[in-house]
């Protein structure tokens, strides 16, 4: 089973909705997903090119959970949370990292105190393409728990927004940092 880079350990899935998983699996097999929040098994056929798609209902906020994907060989995603997920995109004003550019007030203290395991971070690696891409690369190897080690190069605006949401809602929060100063969203 092969999943896109944004389906990893430590991820956050949006609560109270349907999440669409997709990926590649062995030809001639059936893909099964077992969700840790209800131990239900969901099944999807693998098409002639090896691709599959499957929508799975998510519960109210909670976790951590394990998701198990199998086509005969098992892949597990661990420490998965369910809560709020936000996509943060923009140019330099959104890109400015917590430790960067000397403009975040008290950034050393903010980094030292950034211990929020219920806030999860996904940072998209910068890339250009003239055609749509089916996947992205993650700068930190996938979803990470918010900590002093993971926050310095992350978007300060995305981080402070996630922290504010987490304090207000008291649910896991996932933020996706897809920023690039002086860039266009399309050509």
Placement of each model-derived feature along the sequence:
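Short active-site-proximal "capping" loops at secondary-structure junctions
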Residues: 38, 180-181
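Extended, solvent-exposed functional surface patches
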Residues: 86-154, 159, 167-172, 178-180
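Active-site phosphate/pyrophosphate- and oxyanion-stabilizing loops and adjacent acidic/basic residues
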Residues: 163
